[in-house]
Protein backbone atom coordinates (compact mmCIF):
# COMPACT_ATOMS: atom_id res chain seq x y z
CA UNK A 1 0.00 0.00 0.00
CA UNK A 2 0.89 3.68 0.24
CA UNK A 3 2.79 2.79 3.43
CA UNK A 4 5.54 1.15 1.34
CA UNK A 5 7.85 3.30 -0.76
CA UNK A 6 7.18 1.22 -3.90
CA UNK A 7 3.40 1.70 -3.96
CA UNK A 8 0.80 4.48 -3.98
CA UNK A 9 -2.15 2.13 -3.43
CA UNK A 10 -4.38 3.49 -0.64
CA UNK A 11 -5.25 0.87 2.00
CA UNK A 12 -9.00 1.50 1.79
CA UNK A 13 -8.86 1.29 -2.03
CA UNK A 14 -7.18 -2.12 -1.74
CA UNK A 15 -10.04 -3.28 0.48
CA UNK A 16 -12.73 -1.91 -1.86
CA UNK A 17 -11.04 -3.49 -4.88
CA UNK A 18 -10.74 -6.79 -2.99
CA UNK A 19 -14.47 -6.76 -2.27
CA UNK A 20 -15.19 -5.92 -5.92
CA UNK A 21 -13.06 -8.90 -7.03
CA UNK A 22 -14.91 -11.12 -4.51
CA UNK A 23 -11.71 -11.84 -2.58
CA UNK A 24 -12.69 -13.30 0.80
CA UNK A 25 -9.51 -12.53 2.70
CA UNK A 26 -6.70 -10.01 2.34
CA UNK A 27 -3.49 -9.58 4.30
CA UNK A 28 -1.45 -6.37 4.18
CA UNK A 29 2.31 -7.00 4.03
CA UNK A 30 3.98 -3.64 3.54
CA UNK A 31 7.78 -3.62 3.34
CA UNK A 32 10.26 -2.95 6.10
CA UNK A 33 13.94 -2.79 5.13
CA UNK A 34 16.20 -1.87 8.04
CA UNK A 35 19.79 -1.25 7.01
CA UNK A 36 18.82 0.78 3.95
CA UNK A 37 15.81 2.63 5.43
CA UNK A 38 15.08 4.18 8.79
CA UNK A 39 11.85 4.45 10.72
CA UNK A 40 9.67 7.54 10.41
CA UNK A 41 10.56 8.68 13.94
CA UNK A 42 14.29 7.91 13.71
CA UNK A 43 16.24 10.87 15.18
CA UNK A 44 18.73 10.53 12.30
CA UNK A 45 15.94 11.40 9.86
CA UNK A 46 15.19 9.65 6.55
CA UNK A 47 17.60 8.22 4.01
CA UNK A 48 17.37 9.96 0.61
CA UNK A 49 17.17 8.18 -2.73
CA UNK A 50 17.32 10.34 -5.88
CA UNK A 51 16.46 13.33 -3.71
CA UNK A 52 13.37 11.65 -2.22
CA UNK A 53 13.15 10.72 1.47
CA UNK A 54 12.51 6.99 1.97
CA UNK A 55 11.45 5.49 5.28
CA UNK A 56 10.02 2.28 6.62
CA UNK A 57 6.29 1.89 7.24
CA UNK A 58 4.74 4.47 9.59
CA UNK A 59 3.64 1.69 11.97
CA UNK A 60 1.24 3.63 14.25
CA UNK A 61 -0.61 5.08 11.22
CA UNK A 62 -0.56 1.75 9.38
CA UNK A 63 -1.99 -0.09 12.37
CA UNK A 64 -4.60 2.59 13.05
CA UNK A 65 -5.86 2.57 9.45
CA UNK A 66 -5.82 -1.23 9.38
CA UNK A 67 -8.07 -1.36 12.47
CA UNK A 68 -10.37 1.23 10.88
CA UNK A 69 -10.87 -0.65 7.57
CA UNK A 70 -11.03 -4.04 9.31
CA UNK A 71 -13.99 -2.83 11.36
CA UNK A 72 -15.63 -0.82 8.57
CA UNK A 73 -15.69 -3.71 6.06
CA UNK A 74 -15.91 -6.64 8.50
CA UNK A 75 -19.15 -7.95 6.98
CA UNK A 76 -17.69 -7.99 3.45
CA UNK A 77 -14.09 -9.16 3.78
CA UNK A 78 -11.65 -10.63 6.32
CA UNK A 79 -8.53 -8.52 6.79
CA UNK A 80 -5.24 -9.58 8.36
CA UNK A 81 -2.28 -7.59 9.67
CA UNK A 82 1.14 -8.43 8.30
CA UNK A 83 4.45 -6.98 7.19
CA UNK A 84 7.22 -8.14 4.91
CA UNK A 85 10.49 -8.10 6.83
CA UNK A 86 13.46 -7.55 4.49
CA UNK A 87 15.96 -8.97 6.95
CA UNK A 88 19.75 -9.04 6.90
CA UNK A 89 21.86 -10.68 9.60
CA UNK A 90 22.97 -7.32 11.03
CA UNK A 91 19.38 -6.00 11.30
CA UNK A 92 17.81 -8.97 13.14
CA UNK A 93 17.56 -7.12 16.48
CA UNK A 94 15.48 -4.33 14.95
CA UNK A 95 12.97 -6.87 13.62
CA UNK A 96 12.80 -8.65 16.98
CA UNK A 97 11.71 -5.35 18.55
CA UNK A 98 9.22 -4.53 15.77
CA UNK A 99 7.63 -7.98 15.92
CA UNK A 100 6.85 -7.50 19.63
CA UNK A 101 5.20 -4.11 19.06
CA UNK A 102 2.05 -5.17 17.14
CA UNK A 103 -0.34 -8.18 17.09
CA UNK A 104 0.65 -9.52 13.68
CA UNK A 105 -1.21 -12.29 11.88
CA UNK A 106 1.45 -12.93 9.27
CA UNK A 107 5.09 -12.06 8.59
CA UNK A 108 6.95 -12.72 5.34
CA UNK A 109 10.71 -13.11 5.77
CA UNK A 110 12.54 -11.91 2.66
CA UNK A 111 16.04 -10.95 1.68
CA UNK A 112 15.99 -7.78 -0.43
CA UNK A 113 19.55 -6.65 0.28
CA UNK A 114 22.88 -8.15 1.33
CA UNK A 115 25.45 -5.93 3.11
CA UNK A 116 22.95 -3.07 2.59
CA UNK A 117 23.33 -3.42 -1.19
CA UNK A 118 20.11 -3.52 -3.24
CA UNK A 119 19.38 -6.20 -5.85
CA UNK A 120 16.92 -4.17 -7.92
CA UNK A 121 19.46 -1.39 -8.56
CA UNK A 122 22.18 -3.93 -9.46
CA UNK A 123 24.48 -2.58 -6.70
CA UNK A 124 24.72 -5.98 -5.02
CA UNK A 125 25.57 -7.84 -8.24
CA UNK A 126 28.21 -5.28 -9.33
CA UNK A 127 31.67 -6.83 -9.61
CA UNK A 128 30.41 -10.34 -8.78
CA UNK A 129 29.83 -13.36 -11.00
CA UNK A 130 26.43 -15.07 -10.89
CA UNK A 131 28.02 -17.89 -8.92
CA UNK A 132 29.32 -15.40 -6.34
CA UNK A 133 26.18 -13.35 -5.88
CA UNK A 134 23.90 -16.39 -5.67
CA UNK A 135 26.25 -18.05 -3.15
CA UNK A 136 26.32 -14.94 -0.96
CA UNK A 137 22.53 -14.50 -1.23
CA UNK A 138 21.74 -18.05 -0.10
CA UNK A 139 24.34 -17.82 2.68
CA UNK A 140 22.64 -14.68 4.01
CA UNK A 141 19.23 -16.38 3.83
CA UNK A 142 20.62 -19.43 5.67
CA UNK A 143 22.18 -17.28 8.40
CA UNK A 144 18.95 -15.31 8.85
CA UNK A 145 16.62 -18.35 9.16
CA UNK A 146 19.08 -19.93 11.57
CA UNK A 147 18.97 -16.91 13.85
CA UNK A 148 15.56 -15.29 13.40
CA UNK A 149 12.33 -17.17 14.17
CA UNK A 150 9.46 -14.66 14.37
CA UNK A 151 8.07 -15.10 10.88
CA UNK A 152 5.44 -17.16 9.06
CA UNK A 153 6.84 -17.91 5.62
CA UNK A 154 9.95 -17.41 3.52
CA UNK A 155 9.18 -14.94 0.73
CA UNK A 156 10.09 -15.48 -2.95
CA UNK A 157 13.00 -17.74 -2.00
CA UNK A 158 14.80 -17.56 -5.36
CA UNK A 159 14.15 -13.83 -5.85
CA UNK A 160 17.67 -13.43 -7.26
CA UNK A 161 16.50 -14.88 -10.60
CA UNK A 162 14.47 -11.74 -11.18
CA UNK A 163 17.73 -9.76 -11.22
CA UNK A 164 20.32 -12.20 -12.56
CA UNK A 165 21.88 -12.22 -16.04
CA UNK A 166 18.97 -14.21 -17.56
CA UNK A 167 21.46 -16.47 -19.32
CA UNK A 168 20.10 -19.82 -18.15
CA UNK A 169 22.31 -20.10 -15.02
CA UNK A 170 21.17 -23.25 -13.18
CA UNK A 171 20.86 -21.72 -9.72
CA UNK A 172 18.89 -24.64 -8.27
CA UNK A 173 21.37 -27.42 -9.02
CA UNK A 174 24.42 -25.27 -8.33
CA UNK A 175 23.10 -24.26 -4.89
CA UNK A 176 20.95 -27.28 -4.06
CA UNK A 177 22.84 -28.17 -0.86
CA UNK A 178 22.29 -24.83 0.86
CA UNK A 179 18.72 -24.55 -0.49
CA UNK A 180 18.08 -27.97 1.12
CA UNK A 181 19.63 -26.81 4.42
CA UNK A 182 17.47 -23.65 4.43
CA UNK A 183 14.27 -25.62 3.75
CA UNK A 184 15.11 -28.14 6.49
CA UNK A 185 15.39 -25.31 9.05
CA UNK A 186 12.14 -23.75 7.82
CA UNK A 187 10.29 -27.08 8.15
CA UNK A 188 11.83 -27.94 11.55
CA UNK A 189 10.79 -24.51 12.88
CA UNK A 190 7.18 -25.02 11.77
CA UNK A 191 7.41 -22.24 9.19
CA UNK A 192 6.40 -22.26 5.53
CA UNK A 193 7.24 -20.82 2.15
CA UNK A 194 5.44 -18.30 -0.01
CA UNK A 195 4.71 -18.85 -3.66
CA UNK A 196 4.72 -15.44 -5.29
CA UNK A 197 2.60 -15.03 -8.42
CA UNK A 198 4.48 -11.90 -9.54
CA UNK A 199 6.71 -14.29 -11.54
CA UNK A 200 3.99 -14.14 -14.22
CA UNK A 201 4.02 -10.35 -14.16
CA UNK A 202 7.81 -10.31 -14.52
CA UNK A 203 7.57 -12.82 -17.37
CA UNK A 204 9.79 -15.37 -15.62
CA UNK A 205 9.60 -18.82 -17.18
CA UNK A 206 8.95 -20.62 -13.89
CA UNK A 207 7.08 -20.21 -10.63
CA UNK A 208 8.71 -18.28 -7.77
CA UNK A 209 10.14 -20.21 -6.06
CA UNK A 210 10.84 -22.61 -8.91
CA UNK A 211 9.08 -25.93 -9.35
CA UNK A 212 12.39 -27.59 -8.42
CA UNK A 213 12.41 -25.81 -5.04
CA UNK A 214 8.71 -26.56 -4.50
CA UNK A 215 9.23 -30.27 -5.26
CA UNK A 216 12.24 -30.41 -2.93
CA UNK A 217 10.22 -28.70 -0.16
CA UNK A 218 7.49 -31.31 -0.58
CA UNK A 219 10.02 -34.18 -0.56
CA UNK A 220 11.56 -32.85 2.66
CA UNK A 221 8.13 -32.89 4.33
CA UNK A 222 7.14 -29.26 3.88
CA UNK A 223 3.38 -28.66 4.02
CA UNK A 224 2.92 -24.95 4.81
CA UNK A 225 2.61 -22.87 1.66
CA UNK A 226 0.94 -19.50 1.10
CA UNK A 227 0.05 -17.91 -2.23
CA UNK A 228 0.64 -14.21 -2.69
CA UNK A 229 -0.10 -11.90 -5.59
CA UNK A 230 2.47 -9.36 -4.27
CA UNK A 231 0.11 -6.60 -5.36
CA UNK A 232 1.26 -2.99 -5.53
CA UNK A 233 -1.70 -1.79 -7.63
CA UNK A 234 -5.23 -2.87 -8.56
CA UNK A 235 -4.47 -5.13 -11.52
CA UNK A 236 -2.03 -7.16 -9.37
CA UNK A 237 -4.62 -7.83 -6.67
CA UNK A 238 -5.35 -11.56 -6.46
CA UNK A 239 -3.75 -12.06 -9.88
CA UNK A 240 -2.90 -15.63 -10.98
CA UNK A 241 -3.81 -17.13 -7.59
CA UNK A 242 -6.33 -19.66 -8.95
CA UNK A 243 -3.93 -20.74 -11.69
CA UNK A 244 -1.14 -21.14 -9.12
CA UNK A 245 -3.38 -23.37 -6.98
CA UNK A 246 -3.79 -25.68 -9.99
CA UNK A 247 -0.03 -25.80 -10.50
CA UNK A 248 0.58 -26.59 -6.82
CA UNK A 249 -1.94 -29.41 -6.99
CA UNK A 250 -0.20 -30.79 -10.07
CA UNK A 251 3.10 -30.80 -8.13
CA UNK A 252 1.52 -32.90 -5.38
CA UNK A 253 0.51 -30.31 -2.79
CA UNK A 254 -2.83 -31.00 -1.12
CA UNK A 255 -3.40 -27.76 0.81
CA UNK A 256 -2.42 -24.11 1.01
CA UNK A 257 -2.44 -21.86 4.08
CA UNK A 258 -3.67 -18.53 5.34
CA UNK A 259 -2.60 -17.18 8.74
CA UNK A 260 -4.38 -15.97 11.83
CA UNK A 261 -2.35 -14.61 14.77
CA UNK A 262 0.79 -16.27 13.35
CA UNK A 263 -0.89 -19.72 13.22
CA UNK A 264 -1.32 -21.40 9.80
CA UNK A 265 -4.82 -22.45 8.78
CA UNK A 266 -5.00 -25.14 6.08
CA UNK A 267 -7.39 -25.09 3.12
CA UNK A 268 -7.78 -27.83 0.51
CA UNK A 269 -6.53 -27.03 -2.97
Per-range role (PLM):
Residues 114-154:
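Hydrophobic, well-structured mid-protein blocks that either form specific transmembrane helices
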Residues 1, 8-16, 37, 115, ...:
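Charged catalytic cores and adjacent phosphate/nucleic-acid-binding surfaces used
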Residues 82-130:
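Hydrophobic alpha-helical segments and helix pairs
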Residues 1-85, 89, 98-101, 163, ...:
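An N-terminally biased module of ancient metal coordination in phosphate/nucleic-acid-related enzymes
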Residues 26-28, 79-83, 107-109, 153-155, ...:
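Hydrophobic faces of well-ordered beta-strands that scaffold small-molecule active sites
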Residues 20, 65-76, 96-108, 145-149, ...:
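Acidic (Asp/Glu)-rich catalytic clusters
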Residues 33-57, 108-128, 192:
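Active-site gating loops and adjacent loop-to-helix segments of metal-dependent hydrolytic enzymes
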Residues 7, 79-92, 125-140, 165-177, ...:
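Active-site glycine- and acidic-residue-rich loops that bind
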Amino acid sequence: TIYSDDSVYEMEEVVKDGIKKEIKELCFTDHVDYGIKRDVDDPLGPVYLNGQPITNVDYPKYYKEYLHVKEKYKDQITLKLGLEFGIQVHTINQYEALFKAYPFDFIILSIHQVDDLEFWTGDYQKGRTEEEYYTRYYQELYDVVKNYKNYSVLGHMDLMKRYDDHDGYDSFNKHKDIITDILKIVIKDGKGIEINTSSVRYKLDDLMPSKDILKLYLELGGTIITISSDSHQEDHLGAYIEDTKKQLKALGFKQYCTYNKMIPEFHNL
